[in-house]
């Protein structure tokens, strides 16, 4: 979005985003995908657990990391444009963004092939760490190289956030929990750009990458500490297994 606003027109970007949101909403309404598996339908119909039962420290930890992930990604977008603008190479921004996007796709495919998932806080920490040195790049070829690390970890981090939310959410409130996740991520996107923009104004474009990476690290640390302080919460699947064994 930032790239489009800088190279095309803010009005065009606004209309494009609005059209995409509308198309997505219509698509979801038409397809009407199920919010729970068939074996969860009876559980959802039986009871709706109170909010204090599922909105505990672990869920807050995941929502915090969802917020931190999108704060970082939004900041990276702005830092890329700022770096290229300083170098007089804004016309190459599309190439850098394409490299970033392809890296994310490749990272998602590689992570999906792993037999054992990694903790969300670990992936977000790695994403923050590899984002900070991207500010050392001064022109578009090196920036393409610098954003590969962040790109490779983007899809896996977003995927583990969504998976964690799904596992922690009881079937009866899964729609509400997904809404909270969406709100947390939207808030991150909204905060990331102005936060990194202030850092760039006060320093250099490299400060934007550093700020974005540190925001991700802070969210990862917060999520880790919250998860460690909270006792393990049984997932809907484990609860059903326990009930069946009885």
Positions of the model-derived regions?
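Intracellular juxtamembrane helix-capping segments at the cytosolic ends
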Residues: 80, 156-169
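C-terminal transmembrane helical hairpin of 12-TM major facilitator-type secondary transporters
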Residues: 120-159
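A membrane-interface helix-boundary motif in multi-pass transporters
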Residues: 6-19, 198-217
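Helix-to-loop junctions at the C-terminal end of transmembrane segments
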Residues: 6, 105-119, 200
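A late C-terminal transmembrane helix in Major Facilitator Superfamily
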Residues: 173-203
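Multi-pass alpha-helical transporter architecture, strongest
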Residues: 23-33, 211-246
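Juxtamembrane intracellular "pre-TM" segments in multi-pass secondary transporters
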Residues: 30-71, 241-244
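Helix-loop boundary and gating motifs at the non-cytosolic
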Residues: 52-97
């Amino acid at each position: 979005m930032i790239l489009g606003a800088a190279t095309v027109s803010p009005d065009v970007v606004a209309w494009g985003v609005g059209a995409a949101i509308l198309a997505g909403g219509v698509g979801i309404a038409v397809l009407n995908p199920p919010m729970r598996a068939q074996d969860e339908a009876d559980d959802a119909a039986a009871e709706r657990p109170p909010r204090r039962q599922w909105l505990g420290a672990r869920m807050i930890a995941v929502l915090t990391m969802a917020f931190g992930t999108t704060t970082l990604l939004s900041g990276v977008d702005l830092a890329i444009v700022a770096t290229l603008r300083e170098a007089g190479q804004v016309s190459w921004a599309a190439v850098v963004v394409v490299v970033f996007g392809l890296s994310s796709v490749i990272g998602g495919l590689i992570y999906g092939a792993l037999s054992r998932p990694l903790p969300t806080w670990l992936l977000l920490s790695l994403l923050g760490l590899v984002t900070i040195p991207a500010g050392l790049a001064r022109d578009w070829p090196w920036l393409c190289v610098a954003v590969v690390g962040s790109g490779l970890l983007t899809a896996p981090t977003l995927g583990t956030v969504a998976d964690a939310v799904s596992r922690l959410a009881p079937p009866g409130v899964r729609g509400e929990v997904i809404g909270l996740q969406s709100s947390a991520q939207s808030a991150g996107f909204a905060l990331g750009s102005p936060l990194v923009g202030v850092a760039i104004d006060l320093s250099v474009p490299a400060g934007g990458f550093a700020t974005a990476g540190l925001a991700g690290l802070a969210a990862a640390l917060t999520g880790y500490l919250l998860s460690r302080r909270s006792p393990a919460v049984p997932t809907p699947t484990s609860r059903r297994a326990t009930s069946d064994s009885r």
